[in-house]
């Protein structure tokens, strides 16, 4: 569970988030969509404690894991070693990676390869798998699909569905790819210029003129 109330984040004198409130219920998948510069990454970094807030409150129910934009792997380490780093707070879980392999079988096949030898899609799978090693109650993912082929995006999307169904893990999906995010999630928020301008059921937003005009103008092939 995530509960955010009236969150304000500033970079120097510039305000990046203006009193944002948002909630992710246990076992829920929620999308946060918006254009570049809307404040999506700032929000997830504030939720995970990377950025300080000058006002407001963030309340978490259980362990939060964060998949940052850009993957941030250790290229010289193997897939297995990168995964184990995800359980650094929970040493007893470092060898418990079979359940991650069950969600993302490709990781088991490449487990002994170095991360810098792999494709962008495989590296994104590692980043997601590493976050899951802590067995989180809440998973926040920043730009899951960025720069990835449709087949890889489909694999990762199915893994999130399976994770939510099997483990009951709540997911906050921060995405520019609105069609993907709204198709995966049950509820969604739209962020513009650091403010939540709309909250609704994901399917309602998917078929609304508001989102269609602003975020769904590209073809399904471009948006996956």
Please describe what each predicted stretch is:
Residues 114-118, 122:
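Conserved ABC ATPase signature
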């Amino acid at each position: 569970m995530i509960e955010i109330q009236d969150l304000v984040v500033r970079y120097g004198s510039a305000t990046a988030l203006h009193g944002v409130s948002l909630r992710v219920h246990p076992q829920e998948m929620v999308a946060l969509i918006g254009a570049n510069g809307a404040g999506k990454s700032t929000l997830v970094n504030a939720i995970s404690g990377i950025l300080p807030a000058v006002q407001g409150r963030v309340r978490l129910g259980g362990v939060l894991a964060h998949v940052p934009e850009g993957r941030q792997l250790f290229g010289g380490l193997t897939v297995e070693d990168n995964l184990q780093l995800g359980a650094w707070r929970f040493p007893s879980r470092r060898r418990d990676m079979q359940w991650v392999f069950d969600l993302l079988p490709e990781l088991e096949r490449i487990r002994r390869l170095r991360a810098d030898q792999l494709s962008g899609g495989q590296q994104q799978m590692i980043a997601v798998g590493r976050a899951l090693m802590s067995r989180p109650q809440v998973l926040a993912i920043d730009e899951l699909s960025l720069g990835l082929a449709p087949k890889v995006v489909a694999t990762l999307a199915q893994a999130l569905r399976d994770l939510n169904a099997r483990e009951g893990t709540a997911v906050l999906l921060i995405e520019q790819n609105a069609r993907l995010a709204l198709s995966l999630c049950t509820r969604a928020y739209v962020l513009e210029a650091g403010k939540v301008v709309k909250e609704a059921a994901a399917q309602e937003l998917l078929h609304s003129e508001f989102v269609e005009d602003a975020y769904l103008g590209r073809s399904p092939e471009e948006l996956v």
